[in-house]
Amino acid sequence: MEKFEGYSEKQKSRQQYFVYPLLFQEYIYAFAHDYGLNGSEPVEIVSWNNKKFSSLLVKRLIIRMYQQNFLDNSVNHPNQDRLLDYKIFFYSEFYSQILSEGFAIVVEIPFSLRELSCPKEKEIPKFQNLRSIHSIFPFLEDKFLHLDYLSHIEIPYPIHLEILVQLLQYRIQDVPSLHLLRFFLNYYSNWNSFITSMKSILFFQKENKRLVKFLYNSYVSEYEFFLLFLRKQSSCLPLAYSGTFLERIHFSRKMEHFGIMYPGFSRKTLWFFMDPLIHYVRYQGKAILASKGSFFLKKKWKCYLINFWQYYFFFWTQPRRIHINQLANSCFDFMGYLSSVPKSPLLVRNQMLENSFLIDTRMKKFDTIVPATLLIGYLSKAQFCTGSGHPISKPIWTDLSDWDILDRFGRICRNLFHYYSGSSKKRTLYRLKYILRLSCARTLARKHKSTVRTFMQRLGSAFLEEFFTEEEQVFSLMFTKTTLFSFSGSHTERIWYLDIIGINDLVNPLN
């Protein structure tokens, strides 16, 4: 615990000061407006309350901020809500929205400077490829040979709003900025309630998207802070001894063999060298923690997490938020995939001089499968097929042109193949493709008052093939000259597209 407090104080020492004066600079609000227009993520509202950005309005805002001590009134007299008083032109919701976006830009600056000015800590180069913290795709491709249990964690949310301000206080000691943040939270939610209501949270998220993202990321970073600390503590010491080996898996095998050959070797000393192998990934407000050890050790981890949340965030956490499953028997939903960690046999032939050996190794790796029942249910709900998967026509689309009908069906099919290209078994995707193609043909035949057979004989099957081309075929044309890997007919190779993380409706690909 003393090491954790020392590590925490070291991080807190990198606090930044005086970000509040930046709110009086006009370019901050122009930058916030440009970010909303040119941001990497799509936004629904391109201007504040459907009003165009005006430098004149921003200048009026800054002048009135100089003239009136609105921050002092908002803190000392929170019931008056002077900043958002509609009777006064300055205290309007429009100016509050401008301040919210500008504040979100300003408060991110210290965190960006900390990343740029933070000195690089001493690292072992050979260990970089073994870390899987905060990275979804390396986590999915990792080998879990020495791991035994998976802990599914639901990150607690929402929490008391004052705790969000206190978490930022560890990183920023600018008191006026913290008071301004309290003011925004006080206006958009019920400050007297211990747990914020979901209705106020949804409204606050809609009106202050950038600020909400910043607050949530700050909260999650503090939540993950102790996990990163334990990761460094558990990995730093063994690295001095395992750094000479090519992979940690070989080091673990050699240490186990060393304990068998030398029974007098202290078990405590053996554990001193072994790495606990903590694998962690976060997604959609949830987290997965895979580690080595007994079930009793995992129960202690669960109690530790609950006590940590109660001590650090000052609220009671329900134990059902953490589920512990054995790695070999766990099957769960992960980003829209049906995931499990089965044991797959791997035969390796070892040739030593004139002797040949066959080594049977059991590998444990993430297996991602397309949820066929769930997706067919979505197609049935959207009236593409029946509940049993039998294709039907889409009557509501018969008023569209042939090109629009083909484009809509083809886009849905390509989106399915794009998102679920990371599946190790793609036969379900081909079944969904068959449903969509036949549903498209029946929709076109119904529009032209014909049968599917007559319609296909008149136009040919190639008429639909152009619009239902999987992206794997495109990759096969790109890599035919550079690699021996074949995409055509491959049902086990996985292709991960990085943009699927930014998809909001991960489970429902039809939106």
Curated annotation (Swiss-Prot):
The encoding gene: matK
Molecular functions per Gene Ontology: RNA binding
Family: Belongs to the intron maturase 2 family. MatK subfamily.
Keywords for the protein's UniProt record, in alphabetical order: Chloroplast, mRNA processing, Plastid, RNA-binding, tRNA processing
Lineage, top ranks: Eukaryota, Viridiplantae, Streptophyta, Embryophyta, Tracheophyta
Function according to Swiss-Prot or TrEMBL: Usually encoded in the trnK tRNA gene intron. Probably assists in splicing its own and other chloroplast group II introns.
Main location: plastid
Source species, domain of life: Eukaryota
KW Signal (keyword) present: no
Record keyword Plastid present: yes
GO biological process, one term: RNA splicing
InterPro entries, sorted: Domain_X, Maturase_MatK, Maturase_MatK_N
Pfam families, A to Z: Intron_maturas2, MatK_N
GO CC field: chloroplast
The name this protein goes by in its record: Maturase K
Localization terms from the record: Plastid, Chloroplast
